[in-house]
């Protein structure tokens, strides 16, 4: 069952929640542990289609979402600020915005460290060598250290889509084929 695109709606919510979590973690010197828990939870989201559907679905009650999030957090070894944060998000029925909250937290943390964060979409998982090479290329362009967040999307067919701040570089095969298709329509 497709879920409506709520990306525009959630960006403000996600940024506010992420900012609150970051400020709390910074105040208590727990940014690294929150980041580790956040990464662990993101890995679970990436690996589980059921968890993605659960997070995005408005069908479950706040109580059911809270119980599930508590169980998932305990099983994954997520505790402290991030576990409490997940409970608040579930209680407030904002789990649908969780992926945006994770992205926003990473951006805030990277900015705090003087780094630039880049979102990378690839058709296939990147090797460590490819990630290192991409970071070096982005550092040479931006002049700052770059942290990258890689998302795998087979629908782009090949190449990469790289988003750094308000700039986007799209070298995906899908875009190149679309451009070629348009060019052929104009000729024909």
Swiss-Prot record:
Subcellular location: Cell inner membrane
Keyword Transport attached: yes
SUPFAM superfamilies recorded: N-terminal domain of the delta subunit of the F1F0-ATP synthase (SSF47928)
Main location: membrane
A Pfam family per the record: OSCP
UniProt keyword Ion transport, yes or no: yes
Parts of the chain that traverse the membrane: none
Disulfide bonds: none
MF (Gene Ontology): proton-transporting ATP synthase activity, rotational mechanism
Keywords: ATP synthesis, Cell inner membrane, Cell membrane, CF(1), Hydrogen ion transport, Ion transport, Membrane, Transport
PROSITE patterns in alphabetical order: ATPASE_DELTA
GO cellular component entries: plasma membrane; proton-transporting ATP synthase complex
Membrane topology, record value: Peripheral membrane protein
Classification via InterPro entries: ATP_synth_OSCP/delta_N_sf, ATPase_OSCP/d_CS, ATPase_OSCP/dsu
Quaternary structure (record): F-type ATPases have 2 components, F(1) - the catalytic core - and F(0) - the membrane proton channel. F(1) has five subunits: alpha(3), beta(3), gamma(1), delta(1), epsilon(1). F(0) has three main subunits: a(1), b(2) and c(10-14). The alpha and beta chains form an alternating ring which encloses part of the gamma chain. F(1) is attached to F(0) by a central stalk formed by the gamma and epsilon chains, while a peripheral stalk is formed by the delta and b chains.
Role, per record: F(1)F(0) ATP synthase produces ATP from ADP in the presence of a proton or sodium gradient. F-type ATPases consist of two structural domains, F(1) containing the extramembraneous catalytic core and F(0) containing the membrane proton channel, linked together by a central stalk and a peripheral stalk. During catalysis, ATP synthesis in the catalytic domain of F(1) is coupled via a rotary mechanism of the central stalk subunits to proton translocation.
NCBIfam families tied to this protein: ATP_synt_delta, PRK05758.2-2, PRK05758.3-2
Record PANTHER family: ATP SYNTHASE DELTA CHAIN
Family to which this protein belongs: Belongs to the ATPase delta chain family.
Protein name: ATP synthase subunit delta
Organism: Rhizobium etli (strain CIAT 652)
Gene name linked to the record: atpH
